[in-house]
């Protein structure tokens, strides 16, 4: 899975291609 998104609860999921602010970069 790639990309990213944030739920209204404040949790975020990050794909390998995600560069969204607030997401941890691994």
UniProtKB/Swiss-Prot annotation:
Q: Say yes or no: keyword Oxidoreductase present.
A: no
Specify which residues bind Cu(+) 5 according to the UniProt entry for this protein. 12, 18
Positions with a binding annotation for Cu(+) 4: 12, 20
Q: Which UniProt keywords apply?
A: Copper, Metal-binding, Metal-thiolate cluster
One GO MF term on file is: metal ion binding
Where Cu(+) 1 binds, per the record, is at: 4, 23
Q: Which residues bind Cu(+) 3?
A: 6, 20
Residues involved in Cu(+) 2 binding: 6, 23
Do the record's keywords include Cytoplasm? no
The entry's Cu(+) 6-binding residues are: 14, 18
Reading the lineage from the top rank, the first entry is Eukaryota
Q: Which family does it belong to?
A: Belongs to the metallothionein superfamily. Type 8 family.
Any other noteworthy remark? The seven cysteines bind six copper (cuprous) ions.
Q: What is this protein called in UniProt? A: Metallothionein-like protein CAP3
Organism name: Colletotrichum gloeosporioides
